UniProtKB/Swiss-Prot annotation:
UniProt-annotated location(s): Cytoplasm
Protein's name according to its UniProt entry: Urease accessory protein UreE
Taxonomy, superkingdom: Bacteria
Location, primary (coarse class): cytoplasm
One family name in Pfam for this protein: UreE_C
UniProt cross-references to InterPro entries, sorted A to Z: UreE, UreE_C_dom, UreE_N, UreE_N_sf
Any single Gene Ontology cellular-component annotation: cytoplasm
GO BP, sorted A to Z: protein folding; protein-containing complex assembly; urea metabolic process
GO MF term (any one): nickel cation binding
Similarity comment: family membership: Belongs to the UreE family.
Length: 149
């Protein structure tokens, strides 16, 4: 059985109404070729030319014209707060850790090594479960494969 294929992504704000939705974790939103299942239990094949980072609210454009909205899944995260949030953000970024930056808190994926480091420099930490939509890379949309130092 041939699956409907997606070879194009429509970014948030550049499409109107979804025919279905697929819920993906942050890590699963970085893909090139993968079989996915929608919330309505319909399978489709993502077959993109390049590995792509999808954001909450982007849409998979299927070849038959349907749009499948990408929803950020709830994930096990660590909420980071403290009197000097800028300093905490610097330490997180210095370790190339994906970080969701909000006005009064930072969110990162749970990692005991980073958690220990943040505790030692005065962060207040709390485990939470919610969607993870970290900042994209400075050199392009979404994630990159890193850079050399």
């Amino acid at each position: 059985m041939d699956l409907p294929a997606c070879r194009d992504i429509r970014r948030t704000g550049h499409w109107s109404e979804a025919d279905d939705r697929v819920t993906l974790s942050y890590d699963d939103r970085f893909l090139r070729r993968k079989r996915l299942i929608t919330v309505q239990d319909k399978a489709f094949l993502v077959d993109l030319a390049h590995t792509t980072s999808l954001e909450h609210g982007d849409a998979f454009q299927l070849e038959d014209g349907r749009l499948i909205e990408c929803i950020a899944a709830d994930e096990d995260l660590l909420e980071v707060t403290g009197p000097d949030l800028t300093r905490l953000a610097w330490h997180i970024g210095n370790r190339h850790t994906p970080c969701q930056i909000e006005e009064n808190r930072l969110l990162i994926q749970r990692d005991h090594v980073i958690q220990d480091m943040l505790s030692q420099i005065g962060a207040t930490l709390r485990e939470v479960v919610e969607p993870f939509t970290p900042e994209g890379g400075a050199y392009g949309h979404g994630r990159t494969h890193g850079h050399a130092h």
